[in-house]
């Protein structure tokens, strides 16, 4: 490490954490080769939404060092685990919930997982909606079956870079499950602890609607980084979303933010915007919790889900896909802020 370069880098703050890159441990390499400064910066998440700003700030700071005429920046990523990791090898467990059904929660969960994976993170997706599993179908793996490895642990199925477990891949198609609370609790325990998830940066959990046994089992079984609430602008959905938020508060699960799905509709023939389910309701919740994003109502998102391809991959240029990508990156940033804010302050490099 070159001391002069480190001193310059210690003046560059992470825009979200408001601490310098050196004290945060984000500088892996800082060397001077002739008049070229060569540095490697490990971002807090592969989905860092402020990578461009960090690159500009690093370049500007290093060009102020005497003798430096050019800067070469390599970016890596190192997702830091929560203070108390949730499961062996799993850095963060993120719950995706809603107060009621029909708000597009599973679609959001699938696209969040696929987006994080596309950005380079190691992602798992647990379909905890035991009575109405839909993740497997949305990932194009409705006919696949879960198998066991040599340690007799369930081997997650992989699709679009995401490892997932769903009851749809364990029970016969069309068969209804009539389980009481203890059986649900046992199933959730198995999904979490008897599955060979491997090393994951994020395990996204698609919860069933409401505030029932599955939610309680999850919050009692593993250390959860936080929850994302999916709602629509409709008043009745917002009322139920508030109940879900209250449940997580009582279970001491941090609410990372709110996603307003089906926020508006843009007519493809006229370009006019229609607020089919109302407008701005989630911003009231956002006064207490971050509004992670507003996803427009888009028929292609539904078609892509039916076809087994996340919208962010099938139609990445669409407004809905871009909004979902932005939500995933904002969520990753929220997790990084929460995790790194727990680090002790370090003295700056002198």
From Swiss-Prot:
Which GO BP terms apply? Answer: iron-sulfur cluster assembly
- SUPFAM superfamilies per UniProt: Fe-S cluster assembly (FSCA) domain-like (SSF117916), P-loop containing nucleoside triphosphate hydrolases (SSF52540)
> Gene3D superfamilies annotated for this entry?
Fe-S cluster assembly (FSCA) (3.30.300.130), P-loop containing nucleotide triphosphate hydrolases (3.40.50.300)
- PROSITE patterns per record: MRP (PS01215)
Q: A Pfam family name for this chain?
A: ParA
Q: Which CDD domains match?
A: Mrp_NBP35
Residues the record lists as binding ATP: 99-106
Instruction: Give any GO molecular function from the UniProt entry.
Output: 4 iron, 4 sulfur cluster binding
Q: Which UniProt keywords apply?
A: ATP-binding, Hydrolase, Iron, Iron-sulfur, Metal-binding, Nucleotide-binding
Kindly give the HAMAP family that the UniProt entry links to this protein: Mrp_NBP35 (MF_02040)
Q: How does it assemble?
A: Homodimer.
Return the similarity comment. In the N-terminal section; belongs to the MIP18 family. In the C-terminal section; belongs to the Mrp/NBP35 ATP-binding proteins family.
Q: What does this protein do?
A: Binds and transfers iron-sulfur (Fe-S) clusters to target apoproteins. Can hydrolyze ATP.
Q: What is this protein called?
A: Iron-sulfur cluster carrier protein
Q: What is the lineage of its organism?
A: Bacteria, Thermotogati, Deinococcota, Deinococci, Deinococcales
